Amino acid sequence: MANEHKSPLDKRVTDLFKDIPTDISTHLITGETFSNESFQAIPVYTLTNVTVKQAVHLSYKLFESMKTTKCAAGYQYAIYLLAQRLLTPAAGSNDLVFKDYIPQGGSDLPQEIKNKIYVTTELSDSQTAGKSEAEKKKATADLIFGDNTDHDLQQVRSQDDETIIRFGSFISAFLMKLIVKQQSNIVDGWNGMLERYTNFYGESPITAVPKPNADWLAGLKNYLISDPKIGHTWVRVISAAENALSVGDKSFQMVRYLASLPLSLTGMHAYKLFLEVQKQSNLGMQWLLEEMVSPKTLPALEGIAKILKNFESRTSTRKPPYFRYARIMSPAYFQELQTKNCPELVYLLVCLLQKYEAFGAGQEPTKIVGIERVPANIRAEMSRAAGYIFSVAPQRNMGMYSDSMRKALVHQEKASTSRAGKEKADEVFGM
């Protein structure tokens, strides 16, 4: 019988592949190591707040524009400046939420853009000469609102300055999430936003202000992402506020609703899903990470471990939240956690979440961007892996169960999960 044992490769051949570095980056964008210092070194704008009258003017022009189907160029800067001027959540408040959190040392806007935003809202001597107080008041209103009377927005013109600014800045901060969200997110969340406005400020929204349509929002989104420095500046502002404000502060809660939650962990879906799996299962993080290791999942799991060790807060120590916005600031950060770079892990985590019935009615986990590209064989493998992890979790973590709870729960879990572990991927996802 012929000897089928394969001879080892010639040393000349094996020497060709020795000493290949293990930290080679093969991504189109060379990866960079994230740090809080590098986050704060990314170029941003440093913009002077608009005056009260200028903020009223910009708010009114925004409301006018939202009635149309086309967002004009330049509104991305006006909306950012209104968002930067967000007022603290208290009835009649004139204090600015972000007054202490505007980044310094950044660049200014081009003069041609500033001319359209920092408009003149005070009458000159020649414009007031020989005019009555009523005439002066009308002339000032024309400077701010324009001399064409829009009957649909008469309610806006009748409001006091602070009310207009409160609503204009709140809407603008809400619109700023278009730097990462689709326009449907704004449309679907509009009524909820109006309710939150009332909750925060104790007053009704200005009902004459229309909900923008999808085409207008698509235009605004294109303008916002055409200048990434706008998004970088907004992230610096809201992350600084999030880092400094007390968790119990109502301003913190408003910033969290308007910006932190929609922007946090953008492009880091694997990490977001891992946290949710840990939350739903209450299993140890180390145990979960080790159970999910394979050659294809390891790079992303390493990335998760680095974040947990270096950047997440502890129960007794609050750390800066900057890492949560890292991929908005630069696509070179945490690339291993992007869905397209770790589809196997993302699919595995989705399968685990379904085991814990963590998705609400109407939610479709398979609609996560990028997950549709996972091949059928990988889906089947990751579905089986999720079944095995789910089924062995009680047996591998017996120390977390009392004798009574072990008798009541673990036996039942073992029986039910042994069946669940045999499901195919198409059965798991109801396909």
From Swiss-Prot:
Gene Ontology molecular function terms on file: RNA binding
Keyword field contains Ligase: no
Keywords for this protein: Capsid protein, Helical capsid protein, Host cytoplasm, Phosphoprotein, Ribonucleoprotein, RNA-binding, Viral nucleoprotein, Virion
GO cellular component: helical viral capsid; host cell cytoplasm; ribonucleoprotein complex; viral nucleocapsid
InterPro entries: Rhabdo_ncap_2
UniProt subcellular location: Virion; Host cytoplasm
Disulfide bonds: none
Residue segments, region Disordered: 412-431
Subunit structure: Homomultimerizes to form the nucleocapsid. Binds to viral genomic RNA.
Summary of the function given for this chain in its UniProt record: Encapsidates the genome, protecting it from nucleases. If expressed without protein P it binds non-specifically RNA and therefore can bind it's own mRNA. Interaction with protein P abolishes any non-specific RNA binding, and prevents phosphorylation. The soluble N-P complex encapsidates specifically the genomic RNA, with protein N protecting the genome like a pearl necklace. The encapsidated genomic RNA is termed the nucleocapsid (NC) and serves as template for viral transcription and replication. Protein N binds protein P in the NC through a different interaction, and can be phosphorylated.
Protein family membership: Belongs to the cytorhabdovirus nucleocapsid protein family.
Protein name: Nucleoprotein
Native species: Northern cereal mosaic virus (NCMV)
